[in-house]
């Protein structure tokens, strides 16, 4: 079949790769001049199935109120009247129950574990390299209360069969020797030996090169204007360079996905969650991390990428604003400075921001839609890199009529359709001219 993939971030490129490997004729279109130049450009770098957790969790509403008065809060809500934001936040708060958290985390871990396996197979098959390391990840706790609260996550990990190690202070330093100078700040940690790290931008670019060799066509600098519909199906993609037609369409445009389908009657509950990162050149390797260290206090990941350190995280609800907030840079620098002081100079770092496409329940939307020839691969939030290979393969299997290797019914748009049907919303409307 002829397939058009909208978006060339890591989700779009992995989708294109697996679709091409399944024998389809694939074209990818993106407004940028190359792959992974938006949200996939400088993310935190960790591939962490075990840490795949929804932001909607018990206790988060109370924590959010406390964070409002902290200078270095992990979550910031910029004041602005926005109905889409209000609706999304209300749905997120509704998922902050213990029962919802357990369900959401379990299915996120399912997809993330599968994705890591797919990535390993892809690496073995192609020899692709992207500053990857397979040395696990370590979540460090500065307070005993944080360590105690991790018990709920540990229960889910145990139920899902994910290997883990609960470490004391000395165990954390043994796993990450660079923490020796800051050991007094740590009370313990949770290590997941099966997790990985890698440069998402480097991976996406190299996979795009391989996809091109496999027959995929990439069209750069093409702005997508609208999806056109006729007879209950997508008939074309309208761009500033003309119309493209295909048998199937895959929407992988991250936070911008809802804008592409709203006029078709699809109400995607995806909202941008702004994140930040610093990329620091290593000056003292003995003080640098070996893999990824998650700072639970600031919700920051500190990742080793070759001869660089990527410090990424935080969450800012600010709509589609991409301006750089200097206070967020202070928070990232504070986290890495306190845990890995002297490893590099944060003042000379590359400061970046991107928009993560977040769903209220944390689980991405991967699969079919009520429109027969339109598929979604979006809403991965902070876990797009972690879930990319598995999501791309899942989309290819669904389009190709193959049974997926994992349960996928609860990963798609259908879980959000009950409310839409109750409200009497149409499943498909003609595209506006």
From Swiss-Prot:
Q: Which Pfam families match?
A: DAO
GO MF annotation list: D-amino-acid dehydrogenase activity
Q: Which cofactors?
A: FAD
The entry's FAD-binding residues are: 3-17
A GO biological-process term? D-alanine catabolic process
What does the UniProt keyword field contain?
FAD, Flavoprotein, Oxidoreductase
Q: Which domain of life is it from?
A: Bacteria
Signal peptide start and end residues:
none
Give Gene Ontology CC terms.
cytoplasm; plasma membrane
Per the record, the pathway is: Amino-acid degradation; D-alanine degradation; NH(3) and pyruvate from D-alanine: step 1/1
EC main class here is: oxidoreductase
Its Enzyme Commission number(s) read: 1.4.99.-
Catalysis: reaction(s)? a D-alpha-amino acid + A + H2O = a 2-oxocarboxylate + AH2 + NH4(+)
Function text: Oxidative deamination of D-amino acids.
Q: Which protein family is named in the record? A: Belongs to the DadA oxidoreductase family.
Q: What protein am I looking at?
A: D-amino acid dehydrogenase
Q: Which organism is it from?
A: Paracoccus denitrificans (strain Pd 1222)
């Amino acid at each position: 079949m002829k397939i058009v993939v909208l978006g060339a971030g890591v989700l779009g490129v992995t989708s294109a790769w697996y679709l091409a490997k399944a024998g389809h004729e694939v074209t990818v279109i993106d407004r940028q001049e190359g792959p992974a130049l938006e949200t996939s450009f400088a993310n935190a770098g960790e591939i962490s199935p075990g840490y795949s957790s929804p932001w909607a969790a018990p206790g988060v509403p109370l924590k959010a109120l406390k964070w409002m008065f902290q200078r270095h809060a992990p979550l910031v809500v910029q004041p602005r009247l926005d109905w889409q934001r209000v609706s999304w936040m209300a749905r997120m708060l509704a998922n902050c129950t213990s029962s919802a958290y357990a369900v959401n985390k379990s299915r996120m871990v399912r997809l993330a574990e599968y994705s890591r396996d797919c990535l390993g197979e892809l690496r073995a098959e192609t020899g692709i390299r992207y500053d990857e390391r397979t040395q696990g990840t370590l979540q460090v706790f500065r307070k005993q209360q944080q360590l105690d609260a991790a018990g709920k996550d540990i229960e889910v990990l145990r139920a899902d069969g994910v290997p883990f190690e609960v470490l004391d202070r000395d165990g954390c330093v043994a796993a990450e020797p660079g923490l020796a100078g800051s050991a007094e700040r740590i009370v313990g940690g949770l290590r997941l030996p099966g997790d990985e790290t890698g440069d998402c931008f480097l991976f996406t670019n190299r996979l795009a090169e391989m996809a091109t060799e496999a027959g995929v066509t990439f069209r750069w600098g093409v702005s997508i204007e609208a999806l056109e519909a006729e007879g209950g199906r997508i008939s074309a993609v309208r761009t500033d360079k003309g119309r493209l037609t295909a048998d199937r369409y895959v929407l992988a445009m991250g936070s911008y996905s809802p804008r592409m389908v709203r006029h078709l009657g699809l109400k995607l509950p995806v909202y941008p969650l702004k994140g930040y990162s610093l990329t620091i050149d290593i000056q003292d390797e003995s003080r640098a991390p070996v893999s990824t260290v998650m700072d639970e206090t600031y919700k920051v990941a500190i990742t080793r990428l070759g001869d660089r350190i990527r410090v990424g995280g935080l969450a800012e609800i600010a709509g589609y604003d991409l301006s750089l907030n200097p206070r967020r840079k202070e928070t990232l620098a504070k986290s890495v400075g306190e845990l890995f002081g002297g490893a590099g100079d944060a003042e000379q770092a590359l400061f970046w921001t991107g928009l993560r496409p977040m769903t209220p329940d944390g689980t991405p939307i991967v699969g079919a839609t009520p429109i027969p020839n339109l598929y979604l691969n979006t809403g991965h939030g902070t876990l797009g890199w972690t879930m990319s290979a598995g999501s791309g393969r899942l989309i290819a299997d669904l389009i190709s009529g193959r049974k997926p290797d994992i349960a996928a019914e609860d990963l798609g748009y259908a879980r959000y359709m009950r409310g839409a049907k109750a409200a009497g919303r149409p499943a498909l409307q003609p595209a506006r001219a």
